[in-house]
Amino acid sequence: MDKAEYQSRLEELNSLVKKEDYEGALAVVEAVDWRRVKSLRTLGMVADVYEANKRYPEAKKILLMAYDRSSIGKGILYRLVEVSVKMKDFDEAIDFYNEFEAVARHDNSRYLLKYKILRGQKAPLEEQISLLEEYKEREFTERWAYELANLYSKAGETQKCIDACDELILWFSEGKYVTKAMDLKMKYERCHRPSRSNTSIVLTTKRMKSHPRIRKHLKCG
């Protein structure tokens, strides 16, 4: 394949990925020999296409190629952990996690990676909850706050689930995970108890304001 043909294929691939037509993009991906490509962005996109089509071994192969071309590769290592978990290759997932931790010792996302490994291994809920609680102490984000609330629900910790939903709803106000939190909270309030009192909500707000990231945000405001 000459340079002009490769460029044409790459433009087609970019267009298909932008439209989220991953099935069509797969046909383009399989028509190109990616071993000569040096662009980490392009290799990452190719891995995205394979992953979207559940072709995890191929995605992993491309990510390893990208890792070989990268000076640090923190983001690539993160994805290698995720893909290895999806392949249920937990030994390799742990190896990649250890490499990630070595180059990103202070990156809070290491808690999420470890959680994803435990979740894939179907580890006890208490272990999964503990990791997400550690992450929440450092980062308060919608997706993982809801994930933690859902784990509390699965573990039968009803009050903790409701409190976690309240924090998420009060802080973020709207969005996909706020809606999910409202639905999860309502399930318990309909079945087990009346609505939370204003006093409970005030206490939840006070706990939120004590969170380091939220406190910093409030000071900046």
Which residues are covered by each model-predicted region?
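Single-residue signature of alpha-solenoid repeat helices
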Residues: 25, 59, 93, 127-128, ...
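Solenoid-like repeat scaffolds
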Residues: 2, 30-38, 64-72, 98-106, ...
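"A position-specific structural signal for the A-helix of alpha-solenoid helical repeats
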Residues: 11, 45, 79, 113, ...
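Start-of-helix register in tetratricopeptide repeats
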Residues: 7, 40-41, 74-75, 109, ...
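Residue-level signature for tetratricopeptide repeat
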Residues: 12-15, 49, 83, 117-119, ...
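Structural motif corresponding to the intra-repeat A-B loop/turn of tetratricopeptide repeats
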Residues: 19, 53, 87, 121-122, ...
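Alpha-helical adaptor scaffolds
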Residues: 44-51, 64-65, 75-140
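TPR/TPR-like (Sel1-like) alpha-helical repeat modules
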Residues: 69, 102-105, 156-177, 182-193, ...
